[in-house]
Amino acid sequence: MKNLENLEKDLKNDLKKDLKKEKPILVSFLVSGDPNIEATLKFMNALDEYCGVIELGIPFSDPIADGSTIQEANVRSLSNGYKIHQSFDVLREFRKFSDTPVVLMTYYNPIYKRGIENFVIQAKEAGANGLIIVDLPLDEAEQYRAICKKHDMGTVFLVAPNTPDERLMYSDEASTLFLYVISTFGITGARGSFEKMTFEFIARAKNLCDKNKLYVGFGISNGEHAEKIIENGADGVIVGSAFVDIIKEYGDSNETIYKLKELARELSEGIHKGYVKYNEKNKY
């Protein structure tokens, strides 16, 4: 019987094969500077082997789209004196060892204060592949999109179950990395299960959006969730609060590293199972 180390190696090899074949992936989300910036780098390195994309949140004092778990992580980071340049610094360090795509997630205010083009240039130089600005409406993003295009910075826009078809296709066209599909109404945070509406929305988005991969986020916290989302046609799952909960409980410790990797492994296995089921249902 294979030991745990060999099982981990097999899973990592399978993940690399999945990425090459464009199979569904795991996108992990972390809040930069929680509990400290040095720990953020360690957590990114720990999750890197399981993730196709890492989403790094830039702390903000009023994160309106986030639930209590991520709001509290923002508070912890800002209370420790977090500054935006630290996210760029940690990304530069991460780039010394990894080429895994990293997307910075933030709100418009911090970018506006820094200057949109200045922020994009600094993010690009640090090694970011794309940006998600949660509260920037697509209709008001023309300047931002032009600047990102000028500096070859990817853009990701969000869509929700109540997004009209025309808006859905417009968001797909405006996104250049992937489309962030919100699973349900409300804010981020773990949930017990998903409603039929979620799967109907994934099907609608898959039918209408032909440019980008569809990565589904909000409420996914375990392997069973990941399996169900992928089984219903998503190209990836975005998981944040479940990872942040671990960091809150165990802080900057080896136990945190172990728990993060354990959850990432469970999610990856769920993604693989969901992909097998999806192919079985759609092979004819």
Swiss-Prot record:
Transmembrane segments: none annotated. It catalyses: (1S,2R)-1-C-(indol-3-yl)glycerol 3-phosphate + L-serine = D-glyceraldehyde 3-phosphate + L-tryptophan + H2O. It comes from the Archaea. Keywords: Amino-acid biosynthesis, Aromatic amino acid biosynthesis, Lyase, Tryptophan biosynthesis. The active site is at residues 55, 66. CDD domains: Tryptophan_synthase_alpha (cd04724). Tetramer of two alpha and two beta chains. Belongs to the TrpA family. The lineage of its organism: Archaea, Methanobacteriati, Methanobacteriota, Methanomada group, Methanococci. This is Tryptophan synthase alpha chain. PROSITE patterns: TRP_SYNTHASE_ALPHA. Pathway: Amino-acid biosynthesis; L-tryptophan biosynthesis; L-tryptophan from chorismate: step 5/5. Disulfide bonds: none annotated. It holds the Pfam family Trp_syntA. InterPro entries: Aldolase_TIM, RibuloseP-bd_barrel, Trp_synthase_alpha_AS, Trp_synthase_suA. HAMAP family: Trp_synth_alpha. GO terms for cellular component: cytosol. Its EC number is 4.2.1.20. One of its GO terms (molecular function) is tryptophan synthase activity. The alpha subunit is responsible for the aldol cleavage of indoleglycerol phosphate to indole and glyceraldehyde 3-phosphate.
